[in-house]
Amino acid sequence: MKAYHKVRMYRTDVQGVCDSLVYNSKDSCMTMYTDPILWNEGQQLLGEQIKIYMNDSTIDWAHIINQALTVEMKDSIHYNQVSGKEMKAYFINGDMRHIEVIGNVLTAFYPEEKDSTMTGFNCLEGSVLHLYMKDKKMEKGLFIGKSNGTMYPMDQIPPDKLRLPTFAWFDYVRPLNK
């Protein structure tokens, strides 16, 4: 199946937009081309190309290829952000549970206390990062190999550090219904 020009898709668990889409029933892979964006709950994923692998009627995993970015909105000012060359997002029962970020990894995120109070702002970089999700939010991250970064108190965050260079928030184009 092929769809062209201003493709929009909606399911309760995932939404997406792109210019064109190809679905291959042999390997149950849906490939999104040209400015693809995928949303799962509060997570936005984007890259140059997104491949979504299905298992029956649910998403098994997604491969975000080149200039990969995931963004989670905390509030209207604060966003958790991770970018890299590529990402692999793994789903269980329609919920994203694990993201593997590979190559030139940059992060900008707000660690939280148990009561959701933001404790500061953490900027890190490395080569491979594993993110783990719980209750539809980022729970923890683990860099593989060397990483470096800086933790800023909330009142001392440099304005130029608030957004990664590739930051984009496209909630205004997100399909909200069928």
Residue ranges and their predicted role:
Residues 1-178:
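Mature-chain termini and adjacent capping regions
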